[in-house]
Amino acid sequence: MTLKDIVVGFGTTVRSIWLIGMNAFAKRETLMYPEEPVYLPPRYRGRIVLTRDPDGQERCVACNLCAVACPVGCISLQKAETADGRWYPEFFRINFSRCIFCGLCEEACPTTAIQLTPDFELGEFKRQDLVYEKENLLISGPGKYPEYNFYRMAGMAIDGKDKGDAENEAKPIDVKGLLP
């Protein structure tokens, strides 16, 4: 060991002590998470929820577009139909242990039934607890779009109304009557 090695070792030790002393009283960058809230950007994509119409019925029409758009295949559902012809999912299942929270399911949904919330705390001890069924995903409100009702906008016959009686819907045209 030479004198040069001793001087370099002593210098690095003094420099390390100096840097620790300078930063010991600086503002801390680490957040104490449960006590301090985490900043989430306005468009943060978190847990998926299923919303309802302003009438209180499920918005999901089981079109299966969300399952097709999902790049990891974590959404599965089965379509069923009511007596009045309205489609609904018999079961709707999302496996959050596979979900990458990309938001493609929300973009693909024509009825705005699927919406992403800023909730990100999905820690569980068992993987089975990360598989959410329709009952776990349904919320009582309309979510981000409180006035949107797919069946009124789409022109499907609503109980008690004929086609063309809904809002923003033109009366049907008799195409056969236009023939010469």
From Swiss-Prot:
Cofactor: record remark: Binds 2 [4Fe-4S] clusters per subunit.
Residues reported to bind [4Fe-4S] cluster 1: 60, 63, 66, 109
EC number: 7.1.1.-
Cofactor(s) this protein cannot do without: [4Fe-4S] cluster
Key words, A-Z: 4Fe-4S, Cell inner membrane, Cell membrane, Iron, Iron-sulfur, Membrane, Metal-binding, NAD, Quinone, Repeat, Translocase, Ubiquinone
Keyword Heme applies: no
Location(s), subcellular: Cell inner membrane
InterPro entries, per database record: 4Fe4S_Fe-S-bd, 4Fe4S_Fe_S_CS, NADH_quinone_OxRdtase_chainI
Protein origin, superkingdom: Bacteria
Gene Ontology cellular component terms for the protein in this record: plasma membrane
GO biological process, one term: aerobic respiration
Positions contributing to [4Fe-4S] cluster 2 binding: 70, 99, 102, 105
Bilayer disposition of the protein: Peripheral membrane protein
GO molecular function: 4 iron, 4 sulfur cluster binding; iron ion binding; NADH:ubiquinone reductase (non-electrogenic) activity; quinone binding
Ranges of residues in domain 4Fe-4S ferredoxin-type: 48-80, 90-119
Catalytic activity line of the entry: a quinone + NADH + 5 H(+)(in) = a quinol + NAD(+) + 4 H(+)(out)
Subunit structure: NDH-1 is composed of 13 different subunits. Subunits NuoA, H, J, K, L, M, N constitute the membrane sector of the complex.
Similarity-based family: Belongs to the complex I 23 kDa subunit family.
HAMAP family given in the database record: NDH1_NuoI
Record's function text: NDH-1 shuttles electrons from NADH, via FMN and iron-sulfur (Fe-S) centers, to quinones in the respiratory chain. The immediate electron acceptor for the enzyme in this species is believed to be ubiquinone. Couples the redox reaction to proton translocation (for every two electrons transferred, four hydrogen ions are translocated across the cytoplasmic membrane), and thus conserves the redox energy in a proton gradient.
Protein name as it appears in the record: NADH-quinone oxidoreductase subunit I
Name of the gene this protein is made from: nuoI
